């Protein structure tokens, strides 16, 4: 794994803050401020004290999982867990060193009744940055404009998956159209509107009632396809879900033509503007944390599993899933440098 990470992330350099929100159709512009990622060294990390909020709060989009590992990797030892509030608070560390402020990471998705991170951020001023997809940012730009500042995932891990035994000739999402198979997804997803509008899938075959559980997929015996994450479901369905216990086939929605960024970190425009000096220091730390995490995920995964146990909210997640998510993120090219050679930067052609 360390060799994979070194090959992918040999050069951390510049990141340009990209804005999602505005009055035009694309709702995308470029912020001129640049941030410089830290050089690999053992030198003392920059202090965030007095530059950033005393506690930097991140709102995620799901329960604790490896896809959020770069955040949990920044939570220092001796962290405090609020099991009722489904959040963890600790010293914000970079390369193991205390930065002088605290970090709080909040669970999302089913933990918050599926309220979007953007909505939560607008209702709670304590949230500094939240998970924002660039397509969602465009959709919400009228009511809830956001500015995305870093993209830990270069490729959206969202997939459509199917049973290869039931559909041996299906190799892509587009191939599902001819089969007429039902395709379940979370209703309102912009990518599905794109798939049906462009004829990749038939509007009659898509079903927006996916509930995030495997029950219907298993009950259908593989006759229906459904959404998932390339870093999660392929491993889970084959190795953990005893009611299925066999491989699934899949394609990322990115490969099928929907190239928006997912799980980027963004904030309210006024907050981003007011905290430019903070972000110049913080964004490179986030970049570095993603590199450090995929190079050696053991400690952060231990934090994730500890939180899963303490939250005890019905979310089932084990060490095998946590480790597999990192491997799948790397092997599928989801965690990778942008075309400019930078981890975490935005290719603006993808969000226009």
Regions found by a protein language model. Name each.
Residues 20-31:
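Bacterial lipoprotein signal-peptidase II cleavage site
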Residues 75-80, 165, 181, 196, ...:
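Sec-exported extracytoplasmic/periplasmic mature domains
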Residues 1-9:
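Bacterial N-terminal signal peptides that target proteins for export
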Residues 15-19:
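C-terminal motif of bacterial Sec signal peptides marking the signal peptidase cleavage site
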Residues 275-352:
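Secondary-structure end/capping motifs
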Residues 44-210, 217, 224:
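Short, glycine-/small- and polar/acidic-enriched structural segments
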Residues 80-98, 168, 250-258, 273, ...:
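Short, solvent-exposed loop/beta-turn-alpha elements that line the ligand-binding surface or hinge
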Residues 152-162, 243-271, 283:
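Periplasmic-binding protein-like
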